[in-house]
Amino acid sequence: MRVARRSSIVITGYCVNIRTEIPVFSSLSIQESSSIDRRSNCFEFHVSSQAREKYHFDEQLFALNGNVVLADFAAARRFAKKMTKVRGQVVPASDINALGLIDEILHILIRQYEMQNPGVMQRVLGAVGLDARAVLLKFTEVFPPMAVYHREMDARHYLDLETAGQTNYASTLEEMLILHITNQNPAVGPYKELFDEEPLLRSSPYEHTVRALTDFFKGEPGFGDPETKAEDRESLIEVMLAPARIAPLSLSAQLEYLLNRWGVLLGESFVQKILRGIDFVKEDAVRGNFTGGFAGNVPVLTFTSHDYSEYERFSPDKDWMPQLILMAKNSYVWLDQLSKKYQRAILRLDQIPDEELDVLQQRGITGLWLIGLWERSIASQRMKQMMGQADAVASAYSLMDYQIAADLGGWDALQNLRWRAWQHGIRLSADMVPNHIGIDSRWVVDNPDWFLSLPYSPYPNYSFNGADLSNDDRVGIQIEDHYYYKTDAAVVFKRSDRWTGDTRFIYHGNDGTSMPWNDTAQLDYSKPEVREAIIQTILHVARNFPIIRFDAAMTLAKKHIQRLWFPEPGHGGAIPSRSEHGMTRDQFEAAIPNEFWREVVDRVAAEVPDTLLLAEAFWMMEGYFVRTLGMHRVYNSAFMHMLRDEDNAKYRQVIKNTLEFDPQVLKRYVNFMNNPDEKTAAEQFGTTEKYFGVLTLMVTLPGLPMIGHGQIEGLREKYGMEYRHAKWDESVDDNLVRGHEWRIFPLTHRRSLFANVEDFRLYDFYTQDPQNAGASGTVNEDVFAFSNRNGDERGLVVYHNKYAETRGWIMNSAAAMDKASGKLIQKTLSEALSLPKEAYAIFMDYVTGLEYIRSCQELTEKGIFLELGGYQCHVFLDWRIVNGEQWQVVCESLNGTGVPSVYGKFDGLFAAKVEEKIVAEKRVINKKAKSGKKIAKPRKNQSKPKTTL
């Protein structure tokens, strides 16, 4: 830590400063406190000679005054590495940095106090008496400046030297005061050996001197900011002890306290240093707790974020887009499975049998997402094979280039499959991975400046001595050694240019939620040439695939580019080592003025317009991605997680929130029961009633249904992105397939009824007696009930997502935003289905095959009453409106019961009467024939009432 009124030369590995200027403030005004910005970027604190020898600290870490100097986070990491090596347990570098920051802040507060109380630091030297000189002499021996440490001069000589016109006694007294304050701080306990005051207590009148210092400042005016009244100000000693009193066990919390209490006096530049120091603590916590995978609950989606302007610019759908049903297939695994099914080698895309395309068409599938089509990283494959996966291919998301893989048949094979799929009404879909690319990709070799990198390793404990993974003689590629031992997950890899000698450490792709993707290289989106290169690649993909899925798209929204890679001070911590490379909001806006995805959407719409853009996006950004950024579709992970966990009230709230905000967002959700990163649908939902109930919701709610690889067949293995073939020996669940044929595929072929939102309505299910619909009841949040229409077609879906029994009424819809009026509106079930007030409605339950008849008057006044068992589902379709008194008889006779045919029931009730009437008419005819009168021909089915659709 720099001592006031002392010159020092600071030399570190990456920082060379000569510091002599002492900040002097003419007042405590906020405006003028900015002069603190001229302070050095370096922080210092005391380290005893004993600790220096124990840990073998580097000479360049110390200033001439003997204090350890932390010029940047890298210096703190080197210091912590030395301690870690000796102790055998990790010393967080962020703690070392925090020690230096707190020490620096205490010095600044002393300087500020001097401005309020001029000459106080000169008076205190006289007040503590002659004993203080002996104490300061001992202090200088225990915590020696460089010249004393190297025996170039003794401690007394050093103290007699003058800096800025006064001896070093005064500045050393200030250092000793801060040393004492530091020793009273419980949070520094793990590091107390660095600056332990015990040697001073044992061999000098140190305790007496410290007591004299305390008494002196009690008698002086208190200290405070300009807003603090004189009577409310505390002594300087109390002010300096306050952080440890407020947060005795946390250095980070102490920094937060100092920031909140004294930030106005520290100046903007130093405030940012504190914020970055707090971020540094967060980064160390992240780095020490890499776990991977999804953790925690999925939050209920809301639409209240205002980080960036959220205007409405939906991309209009082409006519085919709302009816799309997407099937995901891991390309290599699927080809291997087809080879076994058809008993012949099926290795290329053009060898996929037409019979398989027939099957997809029969099942109502209109989109085929082929995962892993692109040429993959050779380094990624080598890494996996070196770790024991001998038959692995590279990850499907660590790419070499956007060319169809040669072993899949290349572009010719794709063209063949694309044409044949189109004959079956199926469009092909491919991934685009914009966030990162393979560590040995063409871009890493040819355009290293396109990637986020450092000229040095961000952590001193990283080593890069393993195999060269490069397939190009021009460069060397090495990942960090601890990967091979599974003891660390480095945030960078090493790229060595054999032609120029350039060495840089490129960041791995990372979304901040788990471990870095260590076979990938992170692109630098602050550079316009990178953004343009990615847009050109997207256009290339769009010209070959009408459906593009963007991997981890949320990481490239502006707010997350900054949060992850260029964090504002105080907002870092997501990715270790990035806080020190952050930007202010203004700096970031200058670098990336526009949302990248908005540019992509507009360019694709102009150049390849018949392309559906699908974003894998989470983090509460679903609405923003489709409504403002213009993506056609966006992942809705809440569907899978909440329905699996039976967080039914939460998912109903997701739907309600979406309807109240903008129903068009609901239409653009991608709903799924598994995705390649999650367990299979059979593992998560089983293969019985709950599975079919949730799947029914998936294919009848607005949005894009996405069916997983092997889901229909009941396969349970989760296929890794590096799999060439399935590893489990599984058989198709024929009963499950038949269940789909009976319950699901008839619905997929009627997707047009369910796809849109203009007539979609969600209902509350009130648990009430069947004869008491008007009484107040309780909403059963476990029941999902909704209706939709497409012209004259009507549909009502009801599903009970719980193993329990319930009964109640469906009557009024939840509120939905009417964009024409700008108001929230509700409708009754009868209004939503456009039913007449009189007449009768006949409809079929596609789950049971039974038909029902209800009075339209009852549907209008009461709604519909249902009794539901555990995981029971109804899909009421084929609504017909009939009139006539005879249908009243049919309705009353059935009393809500379902029958195979309502018309059959009608015939059963009235066939005898019809026959009697026919016999009577024949008698009249015969009688008239005998009398010679002209006979009118009877009308066919004249007793049947009129039916309307």
Where are these regions (language model features)?
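Alpha-amylase-like alpha-glycosidases and glucanotransferases acting on alpha-linked glucans and related
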Residues: 2-346, 405-419, 423-426, 438-750, ...
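Solvent-exposed beta-strand/loop surfaces of large extracellular or lumenal domains
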Residues: 836-861
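Aromatic-lined substrate-binding rim segments of carbohydrate-active enzymes
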Residues: 375-426
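Extended alpha-helical scaffolding regions
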Residues: 421, 915, 919-934, 938, ...
